[in-house]
Regions:
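Extracytoplasmic/secretory soluble proteins
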Residues: 1-166
Length: 166
């Protein structure tokens, strides 16, 4: 009944989810405020515990954790081989990081004031780019982030015990 009400109130959604045979085979994923989406990263809890660190809850704390992952040998093998943050491309990681700067899209969003915003033209996006660049420059972001093409590449690194967050 709730889905039917939603469709009645939003005929454009019903039109987009109805196939040529007139049937709807799945529920539409509807989010009117992209900033409400959550993008998650997985963090190596064992490394946090080994280093006596708390789960980060701000972007600054996250940065400090990544630095500790890089410099304090949390996997305990005596080598500085840790990759603090890895990703296949930047898709999920980009959205996760951008959320700390107020956006989750590199396209168009509607602000709280109802105005349409092209995200790459905002000050917050510039701050995100500077932060991401800092992670890359300081070796906190995997150097292979732009060349890994499949999840298996990341899984292989993960199986070596060298990835702190992905």
């Amino acid at each position: 009944p709730n889905y039917k009400k939603l469709m009645d109130a939003n005929p454009e959604i019903e039109k987009r989810t109805t196939l040529g045979d007139g049937k709807i085979y799945s529920f539409a994923s509807i989010n009117t405020v992209p900033r409400d989406l959550t993008f998650k990263q997985f963090i190596n809890r064992e490394w946090l515990d080994t280093l006596g660190l708390e789960m980060p809850s701000t972007i600054d704390e996250f940065y400090e954790v990544l630095k500790a992952f890089k410099t304090q040998d949390p996997n305990g093998n005596g080598f500085q081989d840790e990759i603090p943050l890895s990703s296949v491309g930047l898709n999920q990681t980009r959205n996760f990081l951008m959320s700390a700067f107020g956006y989750v899209s590199t396209g168009i969003e509607v602000g709280d004031d109802g105005k349409v915003v092209f995200v790459p033209t905002t000050e917050n996006y510039w701050e995100y780019l500077q932060f991401a660049n800092k992670l890359y420059r300081e070796g906190l972001l995997d150097n292979d982030v732009f060349s890994m093409s499949e999840d298996k590449d990341l899984a292989q690194k993960g199986s070596q015990g060298i990835v702190g967050c992905f």
